[in-house]
A protein has these predicted regions:
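Secreted/periplasmic serine-hydrolase-like ester/acetyl group-modifying domain
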Residues: 113-204, 285-307
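Accessory, usually C-terminal, subdomains that scaffold auxiliary metal cofactors
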Residues: 240-258
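Membrane-embedded segments
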Residues: 47, 51-130
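Second-shell loop/turn segments in exported
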Residues: 46, 71-75, 178-184, 209-214, ...
Length: 307
């Protein structure tokens, strides 16, 4: 058993990407750009699926409130995979708040597949050979014992910027009901692990649902609220009372109601930022010279966002 453990640890070090670029072998460089941020500089970690990286803007949050955040989200990211990403982030940063986008709670997969994802996510963060076991086909001999050197800088801090406008012209989808859509057992298992991890590390946890006409409903809202209430977690659902932050489905989505564009992300993030400023003791870093790169990144962000 000891020999096997040594082999796993050694293989994990040798096969793990030594840079957080696509060329370095990392999966999804945008989601892993936090490796390149100065140590302990990220206060808020945002995880979830494509709704999160489309609808949350770290640089809008920075400009308005001086909070530092990173969106480590991926398409179809499960809660188990969110847990894995958070374990990695916590090795680099002293996170004060975790924002978990809840759309991924309802990503369904076969029991065997979901169990495998949970095991891979929980073990992969500690033993990367489970995540990068196929990398031996591409890794170069001089990379095997090389120390990690993360160089990829994601200006948008994990956000997917989009100037596309394709509005949703349909009817109201948030029709109030007492019904609930069941959260899969595998998701609840992963959620319990994530909630426990936050409690053990004294990290605040916020459940967030960004506007999504095609994937959200009142039945899902009720199910998440039940779990959140049971665990004593705040749940912020931006699909309800959208008018309070000026959201407009005709102008604020890039694909007809599934994901937000950059205009929608700005509106949603400023609303979230106001809520955070009133409910969490987060630090405003705008006057700190150690964070001057954020000002440069914000200027570059403004050049890319046209809506």
């Amino acid at each position: 058993m000891c020999v096997l453990l040594v082999l796993i640890v050694a293989s994990s070090y040798m096969l793990a990407p030594k840079d957080n670029t696509a060329e370095g072998g990392i999966v999804n460089p945008n989601a892993n750009g936090f490796f390149s941020e100065p140590k302990d500089s990220i206060d808020i970690a945002v995880v979830g699926n494509s709704d999160a990286y489309s609808g949350f803007s770290p640089l809008e949050l920075w400009n308005e409130y001086g909070y530092t955040s990173y969106v480590s989200a991926e398409g179809h990211q499960t809660v188990a995979q969110s847990y894995s990403q958070l374990k990695k982030i916590m090795k680099c940063h002293s996170v004060k708040l975790i924002i978990l986008e809840t759309d991924g709670f309802f990503t369904r997969s076969k029991l065997v597949e979901s169990t495998a994802k949970l095991i891979n996510a929980s073990m992969g963060s500690a033993f990367s050979v489970f995540q990068y076991h196929d990398r031996w086909k591409r890794v170069k001999p001089n990379e095997l014992l090389k120390a990690p050197n993360y160089t990829a800088h994601c200006t948008a801090k994990g956000q997917w910027l989009s100037n596309e406008v394709k509005g949703y012209m349909g009817g109201e989808y948030m029709v109030k009901t007492d019904k609930r859509e069941e959260i899969p057992f595998s998701t609840k298992t992963s959620l319990d692990m994530l909630v426990k991890m936050c409690a053990e590390n004294d990290i605040k946890l916020l459940f967030l649902e960004l506007p999504s006409q095609s994937s959200w409903s009142y039945k899902r809202h009720n199910a998440v609220k039940d779990y959140a209430d049971e665990k004593g977690i705040t749940f912020l659902d931006l699909n309800i009372d959208r008018e309070s932050f000026g959201f407009d489905w005709k102008t604020d989505t890039r694909d007809g109601g599934n994901h937000l564009n950059s205009r929608g992300a700005r509106k949603a993030t400023l609303f979230i930022g106001k809520y955070l400023s009133e409910n969490y003791p987060l630090s405003d870093h705008r006057g700190d010279n150690r964070f001057k790169q954020w000002n440069a990144d914000y200027k570059e962000y403004l050049e890319k966002v046209k809506i």
